[in-house]
Amino acid sequence: MRPGFVVAALLLLSPLAAGAQTRTPEEQTFLDIYRELVEINTTDSVGDNTKAAEAMAARLKAAGFPAADVQVLAPHPKKGNLVARLRGSGNGKPLLLLAHLDVVEARREDWSVDPFTLLEKDGYFYGRGTSDDKAMAAIFVDSLIRLKREGFTPARDLIVALTADEELGASSKYNGVRWLLANHRPLIEAGMVINEGGGGELRGGRHLVNRLQTSEKVPLSYRLEVTNAGGHSSRPTKDNAIYQLAAGLTRLSTFDFPVRMNEATRLYFERTASLHTGQVADDMRAVARIPPDAEALARLSRDTVYNAFLRTTCVATRLEGGHANNALPQMARAVVNCRILPDHPTEDVQRTLVQVVGGAPITITPMGEPFNGPSSPLDPDLLARVERITSDMWPGTIVIPTMGTGATDSRWLRAAGFPSYGVSGLFLGESRAHGRDERIGVKDLYAGRQFLLRLIKDLATAP
């Protein structure tokens, strides 16, 4: 076979060949970065975050970044973090661009495709991390390289931090953001942070909403436990540990924490109302007012999504008890997972749990470090810039400030005094993040890349 035919045949066998389209050299460079990241396994079990960080560091150095401005810092051989800097003219505090390199577990037998081979198929990129969070990681590295090649000098330094163990959060002593704050804070000190947590929503192919996250709920689990002397099951007693715990959990199941609105949730309901009609739209406008309407709150609380925006929530997620089929239980234990509003002290949450489940004999113990994460102020200048770029790229799409009901590494930065915002311009339909066959739309990925580059340049030249 002639050499030209050999090359053509190899290209046809490439995982990207089936759906690949003609791309500009810049788009191809970005795709190479993205593919390299996705195809490096960065799961906690067998992956290597340091390998991914070093691969990105090599690309930045090859693009002309001095070694002093590109560092891989690792508290563990496989938990490396990349910190890179494009130096500006010094007019303002740096802008930190944050993404995490680690991904959740993915077993080949659970997927219809190889999770660690980037596949382009039917208008989507498939692979673990394609949406969470290697899309933003690749975009930030690509953006720094593009700006460097353009000779762009920002008014303030641009810092890219690609970190480890976001998915494990507070349970990991190697969480990259927490470790960098504790050990290398000057390298990431910034006046503003752009991170995951926002992003767009597609509905029926329409770009419906671009979200700007300014705050997020704090996750904290509690262990509820009852211990007992037990005994033989042929002689039941009234102080059965399982019954006592079950009674407390039943009381919790009927309890709602009080509504606590903040700046982000008020604006969320005010703007989301425009996407609805009838009673739902009226109720959203009514709860956005000060004070919110009680009847409207009650109706919206029946929806699990809106309820999560309105109050702290605590729900039983695990249950165990007893040690033998013919013995009275000596122990009954449950895990209650709480998602705590950013302005709601964790001490108050625990006191409320004690009151609701009934106190003794049920003990309640936090399973992690109690943590109060503040909100970031809703920056009107940032909001205006996001609105302008969104309107240019997707006319008719509204920007909605929001509070995340999950958790990202922004919580550690907000607590450290870094105003942090979740915004990406990545519009996701069924992304399947954390699930089987994770994917992102090809066009949506490239549009998000363009959105973030425009936003970065905008913010880099801001006074």
Model-found features: residue ranges?
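Acidic/histidine-rich catalytic neighborhood of metal-dependent amide-processing enzymes
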Residues: 124-125, 131-211
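Acidic/histidine-rich, surface-exposed loop or edge segments in extracytoplasmic proteins
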Residues: 31-42, 225-228, 365-372
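N-terminal signal peptide c-region/cleavage motif recognized by signal peptidases
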Residues: 14-17
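Acidic/His- and Gly-rich active-site-bordering loop/insert found
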Residues: 21-128, 137, 147-156, 336
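Bacterial N-terminal signal peptides that target proteins for export
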Residues: 1-6
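Short amphipathic alpha-helices in soluble, non-transmembrane regions
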Residues: 239, 349-357
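A short core secondary-structure module
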Residues: 175, 179-182, 234-258
